[in-house]
Swiss-Prot record:
The gene is yidC. Belongs to the OXA1/ALB3/YidC family. Type 1 subfamily. It is found in: Cell inner membrane. It comes from Photobacterium profundum (strain SS9). One of its GO terms (molecular function) is membrane insertase activity. This is Membrane protein insertase YidC. Disulfide bonds: none annotated. Residues 28-62 are annotated as: Disordered.
Length: 538
């Protein structure tokens, strides 16, 4: 197999990979209710106390009496009716590259609802079919002050001698928000409550594009399952209802995630459901009994922010797995760590990608050299193989035997030119996912006209240069292909690749371009070495 056939193999493998992942995203029917306005009410969102995952009857009790909570990285809007987070702005991330507006992860708008809810159900709960508690606050705006590392925002409600205090606890430079329920029972009898925390979002499908497939939907982690996606289609087909001591429930989208993590040593209930065009995923903490004259605090943590692996891993076990590298995670994860380490030194993600390319291609150089050497030996055998075919004609069995004897005599592995390519493809695919899933590349500039490595090149300069580099590799590579159709396909291959890469994120195109430049340099060195051995001629 010669170099040009290798290029064809790479193209077929790569395009097949893209088509497969897109089919994998699209092979299920579209969920219902996408893009339509839903009539939503807060009390109808409250899960039942029974733990069966079914909602209680809807009731019209909604409020927009809001308070705002601001830190250095988060701006939250909280409804005082129940204390739901109905908006979350990520202050360190712009909505668009050229926009000064912050990215809004959670929002509650007509036709587009994505909020984080929490409350108390049970015999003495304050969130039920009859309505939700109107919580009292001391101010409308709360801000983390300069020099302050923690902000606590209490919201209170008093009923039947019991004081319920819902407190949002936020820390500087953190996307983890602790939600505490303190129940001070000064009544004459014991009180029984159960805390729930859930995420609610419109049922929708966001599979991205062929070149950048993305997932939008649910996910969870339990004692027995580190990480599993549970799509909106899954929620409509079957509601989850499972018990776990450790775990979390989350909603995912490209680059960002929201998740509830119960803070309880006892088993919690993890559930999903779909109702009225909305999908829910959440957790119920175990039922708690508070004796008369005592108080107790129940806590769950809300992660609402970007997919930052180190920070998420510190917040909850396996939450970092929401950065989904697919089945090649064991390659992609170390590549991302190496990329991040390089960026911490050079200070630019584009330069880090270039450096990573040099490191990866340098590590694979022995394979590349073995590949070119094997192909050169195969070319030297072509006259003998041609003569053998003419001599043996249609006797395929004898032809196969004599070919194997010739390969053994000349110490040539007929798969030697193909195997290195097959071994290199998983590395490229893993790097592809590493770059696609890295929120750090979002809106990160390179040089000149590249202002966002996660977006396509606005002027298509990098894809065109990549196409030119592929064409140069072809021209430098000797070939034994004589079939006119194969020659046309190989000539067209750089054009096809250039077209595909027009729509790829510029960070990935940069990797491929630099990789091609390295290939040209390695080809030159290897061919010079082969010339000295008489295995290559210019």
């Amino acid at each position: 197999m010669d170099s040009q056939r290798n290029i064809l193999l790479i193209a077929l493998l790569f395009v097949s990979f893209l088509l497969y992942q897109q089919w994998n995203m699209d092979n299920s029917p579209q969920p219902q209710g996408q893009g339509t306005e839903q009539q939503v009410n807060n009390s109808g969102d409250v899960p039942s106390h029974s733990g069966d995952g079914q909602p209680i009857p809807d009731q019209e009790t909604t409020s927009k009496d809001l308070i705002t909570i601001n830190t250095d990285v988060l701006a939250l809007s909280v409804d005082t009716l129940g204390g739901d987070v109905i908006e979350a702005k990520l202050l360190a991330y712009n909505n668009e590259l050229d926009s000064a507006d912050s990215f809004i992860l959670l929002k509650d708008e007509p036709g587009l609802s994505y909020i984080a809810q929490s409350g108390l159900i049970g015999a003495n709960g304050i969130d039920s079919a009859n309505g939700r508690a109107q919580l009292a606050v001391t101010a409308k705006d709360f801000t983390l002050a300069d020099g302050q590392d923690e902000l606590r925002v209490p919201m209170t409600y008093v009923k039947d001698g019991i004081t319920y205090t819902k407190t949002f606890v936020l820390k500087r430079n953190s996307y983890a928000v602790d939600v505490e329920y303190t129940i001070d029972n000064q009544s004459a009898s014991a009180a029984s409550v159960q805390m729930y925390a859930q995420l609610r979002q419109n049922l929708m499908d966001d599979g991205g594009s062929l070149t950048m497939p993305t997932y939008r939907g649910g996910a969870y982690s339990t004692d027995t399952t580190n990480y599993k996606k549970y799509s909106f289609d899954d929620m409509q087909d079957k509601s989850l209802n499972m018990t776990t001591t450790n775990g979390w429930a989350a909603m995912l989208q490209h680059y960002f995630v929201s998740a509830w993590i119960p803070r309880s040593e006892e088993a919690s209930n993890l559930y999903t459901r779909a109702s009225n065009g909305l999908g829910y995923i959440g957790v119920r903490l175990p039922t708690t009994t508070i004796a008369a004259g005592t108080e107790q605090t129940l806590t769950a943590t809300l992660w609402v922010g970007p997919k930052l692996q180190k920070e998420m891993e510190a917040t909850a076990a396996n939450l970092n797995l929401t950065v989904d590298y697919g089945w090649l995670w064991f390659i992609a994860s170390p590549l991302h760590k190496l990329l991040s380490f390089i960026q911490s030194i050079v200070g630019n993600w584009g330069l880090a990608i270039m450096m990573l390319t040099f490191i990866v291609r340098g590590a694979m150089y022995p394979l590349t050299k073995a590949q070119y050497t094997s192909m050169a030996k195969m070319r030297m055998l072509q006259p003998k193989l041609t003569a053998m075919r003419e001599r043996l004609g249609d006797d395929r069995q004898r032809m196969s035997q004599e070919m194997m004897e010739l390969y053994k005599k000349e110490k040539v592995n007929p798969l030697g030119g193909c195997l290195p390519i097959v071994l290199q493809m998983p590395i490229f695919i893993a790097l592809y996912w590493s770059l696609m899933e890295s929120v750090e590349l979002r809106h990160s500039p390179f040089f000149g006209w590249i202002h966002d490595l996660s977006a396509q090149d606005p002027y298509y300069i990098l894809p065109l240069l990549m196409g030119v580099s592929m064409f140069m590799i072809q021209k430098m590579s000797p070939t034994t292909v004589t079939d006119p159709m194969q020659q046309k396909i190989m000539t067209f291959m750089p054009v096809m690749f250039t077209f595909f890469f027009l729509f790829f994120p510029s960070g990935l195109v940069l990797y491929w371009l630099v990789s091609n430049v390295v290939t040209l340099l390695q080809q030159t060195l290897i061919y010079r070495s082969l010339e000295k051995k008489g295995l290559h001629t210019k």
